[in-house]
Amino acid sequence: MQRYELIRLIGKGGMGEVYLAHDKACSRRVALKRIREDLSGNALLRQRFLREAKIAADLIHPGIVPVYSICSDGEAVYYTMPYIEGFSLKSLLKSVWQKEVLSKELEEKTSVKSFLPIFDKICATVEYIHSKGVLHRDLKPDNILLGLFGEVVIIDWGAAIFKHAKELKLEQDDEAAVSFDERNICYSSMTIPGKIVGTPDYMAPESLLGVEASEKTDIYALGLILYQMLTLAFPYRRKKGRKLSYRDVVLPPIEMSPYREIPPSLSQIAMKAIAINPADRFSSIQELRQALQPYLQGDPEWTVKATLMAKEKSCWKYYDPILLSRYFPVLASSPAQWYNFMLSEVEISASTRVEYTVTKSAVHEGMGILFLPSKEAERGEFYCGYGLWFSVQNHELTVSLIKNGIEIQKKSQEMISQQSRFAILIEKSDNRIAVFVEQALFILHIDYLPSLGNRLGVIIQDLQGMSNIAISESIGALRVSCLAVPDAFLSEKLYDQAAIFYRKIRDSFPGRKESYEAQFRLGVTLLTQIEEQGGDLTQALSSFDYLHGGAGAPLEYLGKALVYQRNGSFVEEIRCLLFALKRYSQHPEIPRLEDHLCFRLYDSLHKHRSEALVFMLLILWIAPEKISVREEERFLRIIYHKQQATLFCQVDKAPLQFRSSKMELFLSFWTGFSLFLPELFRRAGGLRDYQALADIFYVAGVSGNREAFMQFSTALANVSDEITFPESLHNQKVAELMFFVKGVEALRNKDYQKAKKLLWKTPFTLQLYALDMFHIQAFLDEEIESFIDLLQAIYDPTSEEERDHILVYIIQTHLWNRDLERAYKLLNDRFPLDEELAEYSEAFILWGCYLALTGDRVAVKAHFSRCRYKYGKSALIGKCVDGDIFDYLDNLVWWEKKMTLFQSYFLLRCLNESPRRYEKYRQAYLSMENNFFD
């Protein structure tokens, strides 16, 4: 041991001693464990000690301290490990034993919420060692080390052994294991060397009776650890040294420590883990961890509070016929019909789940679910609060979300024609309401103000078609929050009183969640007050500054995003959300921002589809699990027309998959949101995906993002000698992409002959991309001859199928040169003007330009008046004939806006309008950010 200088003893077990030591060779601190001197002469214990070291050395996991070295030469038997600063789980538990009052810091450290992630890490480590065939056999708080920097490691592998190993039998034979009387087992918290392997207090009953160890014995020990974490007490209430029968009743955690507010099912998990009969325990660590997942993920536990029978009047406070128009005046369908109205006798909590099934026929004329504030409900003002209206027409289910009589969200979806009954689930929390139909999310709304109502109302015509209504309550809702008082003032629109109490709570709980939550709600209160009473909404921004850099830092940016959203500053809203998501990616409040993104997606689909694609991209990038498979299909339908109008989707005939890099690139292209392009480029390069790299270059170039284009060009040049793409991608080389990049640069520098020579060395797809990137600028700069020359050079050697892709450019040049005969022939032959010609297609707009060249303005307006989408791109281009369209552009996505400006410019040139008119559109196009050919 000359290499090591012992500093001090830091731990002692049944077989070994652990010292803090200085490693002279490496000049570092290590933990050195050696066999106890009084046991060093025992050959069997010496063998077990070395087995411990070798087992630990073979296991590689964050929850296991790695072994640096093992020494068994001569009398010295020891091994070394990294020294981890921290404390044992036992010392943390011991710090709160028999204490009636805990400090805020200690209360937080020993809360159920804080302990569960620690326990899950312990379980993950044990799950790993079980997968390697190892049993620990001495799991206890003493052997769990909590590092100062979040480490959770299992130590002391002296009792560990491989399952089914010969040593199990040898221990029973050679160690003369003691026979135990099951009626009178004396528990101990210390491992007994040479007698029994493990610590009796944490050993399963069958182990104390001499039964061979198994995974179930480790699960039992973990159950005892979980029990102590939940209760801060050991399950056996006994005086030290008293003998105890293991058949004695063990109180469930929820009864042992009622003040700890332990969810009943979590209590049951602990009891199942420490069941006397091994068959009654969890079958594996994996099953135990799965049972804990809802609590680790923050999912609420629901217990049924009441069951309401639709036809049983005793379940309802009010049960009367009513006119629908009084409750849902905004509905277009049959508002004058009479319906049954029922108001629940029972009040519902802040977190409530409503579940029922209903027949399709019962909602043919519609049915409503209301969440009403009690005060208004008592006065008979049933139009206040939130309402959901369900109706089925022609196999299509429509759900409307209504607030205070105003429809704020609506969604329709086709149902299975044979389906006669469907299940509806509504989850309501302080600030969130979610509607699920057949387990698929249908509507999500977040208010950020706890005012969703606490009485349930039902409006329906056909009572026979509705099942009983199950009202479940979240366990978390049983706690009365200190925020309830200001929340109540807020729900009554008593903003000043609410603000006073929010400030008091903020100042009373510094550094705690209650404090930053109160400040966040204070900011939302002031924002709502300004919005209702009139004023500058940006005044509310300073309220969220208070959260800067604190425990609730992400909420600063969520609050500011709300201000910008209500102020109509979409770009600033996105900046705030992105900053929080990037800077605080591991913060506990980030799921709240992810929920907000999800809400904004659905909200913008209803109000501003131009914004929806941005939120779709952000969710795909940050929280793709938030979107269900059924929602994927819906979103793919929404973007179908844009997909058909996207060049790199036309070139690649493979279907666009929603959860794919190509979808992320597609959304980046349409939204002009280029933040994720570098990562997409890195990902495509790593996969050697030639087509993806080409698509990314195209998107960066055609979007005008010169900086990204050149950045990718430099990155590609650095690996041009190293990479050859696989044969499955036609063995395309990086050199072809480099020719493309240099060719595009030559086009930008107006060196057209050089560009042609470089692009000649590239495949048709890259030539097409270069052509598309160049054609807009050629028309804007009125350098058509150069474009025609490049177009002809690409056109001549191509196949018939490839020529279809560049036909549009040829027609454009004919229209520009006022060659009506050639333009008409190509248009009529390939894109006949009939009802099947889609308004979103390029050919539809080119027909409008052709009609403009004929001088028939009436025909032009008649052509564009066919558009079904009044504020779509084609319809807006038609509007520019008689007036400006700039006020309508906000309804369009970024790329749609650019193309609308260009095509309006092109149409006005064809109409032979004055330069003053078409120049406005040209300048507006050029002024849009990231124009590549500036």
Swiss-Prot record:
- What gene is it encoded by? pknD
Q: Which domain of life is it from?
A: Bacteria
Identify the catalytic residues: 138 (proton acceptor)
Which residues does the annotation say bind ATP? 10-18, 33
Pfam families cross-referenced by the UniProt entry? Pkinase (PF00069)
Native organism is Chlamydia trachomatis serovar A (strain ATCC VR-571B / DSM 19440 / HAR-13)
Protein name in UniProt: Serine/threonine-protein kinase PknD
Q: Any idea of its EC number?
A: 2.7.11.1
The answer to keyword Phosphoprotein applying to this record is yes
The post-translation modification note in this UniProt entry reads:
Autophosphorylated on serine and threonine residues.
Keywords, A to Z, come to: ATP-binding, Kinase, Nucleotide-binding, Phosphoprotein, Serine/threonine-protein kinase, Transferase
